[in-house]
Structures are given as structure tokens and as C-alpha cells.
Amino acid sequence: MAYTEVDPEAAAAILKSAGCAPLSAVQSISGGWANSNYLLELEDGERLVLKIWDERSPKEVNRLNSHLELIASHGVPTPVPLLLEGGSRMLEVDGRAWMLLPFVDAPWLAGDRSSMKHLGELMARLHSIPDDGTFISEYTMGTDVWPELFERAEAENTWSPFLRELEAELARLPNLLPAGLPRGIIHGDLFQDNVLASDGEVKAVLDFEDVCINVLASDLVVAFIGCGWEDGVPVEERWTALLEGYESVRQLSENERAALPELYYYATLSVAAWRYRKFRMEVTGTEHSDRYKLMTERLDIPLPFLGYQPRGGAR
């Protein structure tokens, strides 16, 4: 997805700053709703990804880059931005952060057992990284940001049945989850287009912009929401492989297992809430305006392997 057009002079400047060959061709890359991504082909045959951050400030991006260095150093495969002149990993252009990333030549995660198991292993490895004190605790894809939707609906008089249901669910949340669930570094948005895999192996985990300190098991159910369904149908084998890989590195506690149904419920609602905000409150009048309903409809489907049973609401 591209929101910001590439200025050839700026592209040439960042390539020069990274010590790269001149630009030969540029092509927009699909995927992502918060930034613009381009594939750059250089005159020496090298390929790089140019990422332009449309919704994050340069200060936020700079912090994220330090997170990526830490995560990659612990064996989680993720592209780290190239170093530029002066030691920075980004260039500020018209108030936006631009950065160059290594190009990983692999397709999106297909959902085969081996890849799902490997993804589970990598998630557990991520969850085992010690917090260095620089990660935020607000989960921008979770329930933490629901109050912002309510404030906007109140200010603009745009309340809807869906938002009212979210409001009611948020009030119930503290009584539904056990206290003291293990917390740590989570990715927060592990959907298939954020995972590159081939030959049964994850080659790269992408887009850590929602990385934060949160409930670890919530990351596991989000990965199932994003990678464990096929044509609107939950695939039990994908969950089994994901969990098997995860627990080969880190065992879930009994409290975490017991919390999985509620974590799944609220994670699914959170994805729906993100889509509602994006396509009903920010980018309106598109073919995606009802996309949030694809998530709420999933809540009507029982998942015995997760211990989840539908309870109605949020429709």
C-alpha cells in the first residue's frame, strides 16, 4: 500500500547515504495500512525495500529501529534498516521517516504445518527477550485504544451499535481475565502478510510497529486470528502446529490456557475495532467499510480446540 509518492531525488539521497548503487527502477509493494512501501531495484542488481512511515513520527520510528536491532540480535529474523551516514537508520523527508530495508525474497506465510510450527517457535523466542525498558505498554491493536474511539464518537456524535457493544465489553474485561498473566514483548499484529515463509520455514517477521509490553498469550491468539483461518474457516491443525512450536520453547501456564477463550474473544473484537476505526472513521466510503464485520462474524463460530464458545453481542 502506498500513500506517499516517492520523490526520486529523496530516494537517490537515501541510497547514497547508505552507500548503495544508483536507483534503476521502483515498484509499489502491496500490504500495510500505515505506511508506504516500495521495491527498489538498483543498477548493481541489488533489491531493497523503501519504507515511508505515514502514521508514525520520526521519533517513534527511531525508537522502533532500536527495538528491531534488539529483537534481531535474539535470533528472531526481521529486516533491520540499513545504516546511513552519521549512524542513523532513517532519513527525515518532509516530516516523514524514510528507511531502507533488506529485501527478503519469500512469499507470505501459506499456513502449512512446518511454517506454523516455526512461527510458534519464533514467537516464544520473541516473548523470552528481556525488556530493556524502552518498550511502551500501550497496545495499539488491542483494547487499550478503544476509549479513543468512544471519545471520538462522543465528540462527533457518531455512536453505533458496534461501538456501544465495545464499550460494554471493555467494562466487563477486568472481571473476565485472571490477574497476573505473564507479560513481555509482543509483536501484536502477526497476520499472514507480516510473515514471509518458504520451504516450511519463516524467513522474516515484518512490521513491528505495534510491538509493546503486553500479555504474552494474547500474541498467540492474534497469530491464530491472522494466520490460522482459510476462506473464513478456522483450521485446527494450524493452531495445533502454532502451539506445538511455541511450547517447544516456552510452556503456557495453566492460567494462560484458561484465559485463551477470553483472550481470543477480545483480540478478535480488537481487530474488528481497528478496521472500524480505519474504514468507518478515518478512510470512509471505500469497499472496506464493512470489513470489520468479517471479524465479528467469526465470534459466532465455536472453536473447541481453544475452548471458545460463542456468546453473542458485538454484531
What kind of region is each of these model predictions?
Residues 43-135:
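ATP-binding pocket architecture of kinase catalytic cores
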Residues 1-83, 198-201, 306-315:
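Conserved NTP-binding catalytic cores of kinases and kinase-like/nucleotidyltransferase enzymes
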Residues 110-161, 181-183, 213, 289:
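A cross-family kinase active-site recognition segment
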Residues 217-251, 266-283:
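Active-site activation/catalytic loop segments of kinase-like enzymes and analogous catalytic loops
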Residues 152-153, 271-315:
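ATP/Mg2+ or Mg2+-diphosphate-binding catalytic cores
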Residues 30, 35-42, 49-50, 81, ...:
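Active-site acidic catalytic loop and adjacent metal/ATP-binding pocket
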Residues 97-111, 147, 151-152, 269-285:
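A glycine-centered beta->alpha junction motif in the catalytic cores
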Residues 252-264:
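All-alpha amphipathic helical-bundle segments outside canonical DNA-binding/catalytic cores
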